[in-house]
């Protein structure tokens, strides 16, 4: 659909209402009207179909097996044990018997059919979780560092992020009228949208809060990022980054992944003001005629960073202070138990590709259900698609450990290679309509093929950051990985190499449109050289750059590597 069509749909939607009620009530099809397929995204859902069944249903002269993905708005991915049990029940009753943790710390339900869509939405809201603005041209789910090592400062960080998430919600009551049967006030007219306006944003907008020394949120991949500045265990404020974004288009030189620029420091008191100024600047200056160039990163590149920063400061009435020193050590998760400052413990467990399900050889869904039934602590989803069972007292650890062992949940500690512990993948086939190749379903197979090579060179326990994406939109943030596979066609990928383990450098194209056999053949000699010639503690991506095997792509520096001048 063209940019002009989408902008027209938004503008005429009566604040995201459209004809959704009529589409939902139509029993003759499992799909929505075309315009409503755009609008339902703002309510937290995508219309999809099972692509594994497309050809068979076409032969049977049936419409596609339409279904809906529903995504939650859970800032920082924090939920209670009771909420976990409710989401589990929803997944089992209405979806495909699985919960999917996203790279933005949300939950996704897949396989919901249209006639049960409203009931499912109501069940999610009954858990005191909503889906408003989880998709669409608005601010999406706000990421928050899952690092439990700085408990007091982290609590403030989460509070700020949750407050910002609420502040940036659309003002329309459409969500509550359509899904929760709220009565529209007669004669009230359309609501004002003071932040978004009648056409909302040109494209999606992503925000992340990072807490050094861990960059688990990949803060530089966000349109707007906040890097916590913590002094004497107190959160003073944030270094602000703008202009990150992973999406690109294969073969189109006018699109590219980009990492954000650090533009200065703000105090906590200025968080809402500066964020509003940044979002409204993108609202007014973003490209609404060419959707592939509508993200904030292109607005900055087209108009110039100085111009955009000046506009932001003028709107906010704030002069940004010089950025404060910080250091990122890595962007991964630390598995196992970690003690927080307050004496409580936090257990990080691996969720392969973020999928929580009971399958042959795996009882993740049942295991986490049993832990939730203990009613202790809270669950925190990580930006690496894993889960932290947080806030556990020393005396409660044994009960959790017993269930972890019983249900085999400690895969992070038992994974055969460090690669498996540092891998991510998007959903891709069969549900994502944009996928060109497999990702989530392919990840374990690819890991199994790469494992013997790693063992051959003594690298089985060497952390290497691997990410697989089914298409170039990059939901798994592949362009930051040391090794990335980006889907080009069924069974074929672009091989990207040279990111780092801190989320501060983009990788570059190494081989284009190649098969699994060609990928493994390309990687083996590089891994062999890495084993022989690496420096102590040198990451694979850093090695590739130091030795000249990989060079920075021919883009301006700010699209690819963060300067070290701000590192303490």
Swiss-Prot record:
> Cross-referenced SUPFAM superfamilies, in alphabetical order?
Nitrite and sulphite reductase 4Fe-4S domain-like, Nitrite/Sulfite reductase N-terminal domain-like
Query: Which cysteines bridge via disulfide bonds?
Result: none
Q: How is the cofactor bound?
A: Binds 1 siroheme per subunit. Binds 1 [4Fe-4S] cluster per subunit.
UniProt keyword Ubl conjugation present = no
Keywords noted in UniProt: 4Fe-4S, Amino-acid biosynthesis, Cysteine biosynthesis, Heme, Iron, Iron-sulfur, Metal-binding, NADP, Oxidoreductase
Its UniProt pathway annotation is: Sulfur metabolism; hydrogen sulfide biosynthesis; hydrogen sulfide from sulfite (NADPH route): step 1/1
State which Enzyme Commission number(s) the record gives: 1.8.1.2
Which Gene Ontology BP terms does the record give?
Answer: cysteine biosynthetic process; hydrogen sulfide biosynthetic process; sulfate assimilation
**Top EC group:** oxidoreductase
State the GO CC annotations: sulfite reductase complex (NADPH)
Protein's UniProt keywords contain Cell membrane: no
Q: Which reaction does it catalyse?
A: hydrogen sulfide + 3 NADP(+) + 3 H2O = sulfite + 3 NADPH + 4 H(+)
Q: Name one GO molecular function term.
A: heme binding
In this chain, siroheme is annotated as bound at 475
Name the coenzymes or cofactors required. Answer: siroheme; [4Fe-4S] cluster
Q: Which InterPro entries does UniProt cross-reference here?
A: CysI, NiRdtase/SiRdtase_haem-b_fer, Nit/Sulf_reduc_fer-like_dom_sf, NO2/SO3_Rdtase_4Fe4S_dom, NO2/SO3_Rdtase_4Fe4S_prot, NO2/SO3_Rdtase_4Fe4S_sf, NO2/SO3_Rdtase_FeS/sirohaem_BS
What Pfam families does this protein map onto? NIR_SIR (PF01077), NIR_SIR_ferr (PF03460)
Ligand binding ([4Fe-4S] cluster): 426, 432, 471, 475
Q: Which PANTHER family match?
A: SULFITE REDUCTASE [NADPH] SUBUNIT BETA (PTHR11493:SF47), SULFITE REDUCTASE [NADPH] SUBUNIT BETA-RELATED (PTHR11493)
State the family named in the UniProt similarity comment for this chain: Belongs to the nitrite and sulfite reductase 4Fe-4S domain family.
Task: Describe its assembly.
Answer: Alpha(8)-beta(8). The alpha component is a flavoprotein, the beta component is a hemoprotein.
Instruction: Report the protein's function.
Output: Component of the sulfite reductase complex that catalyzes the 6-electron reduction of sulfite to sulfide. This is one of several activities required for the biosynthesis of L-cysteine from sulfate.
UniProt protein name? Sulfite reductase [NADPH] hemoprotein beta-component
Name its species. Xylella fastidiosa (strain M12)
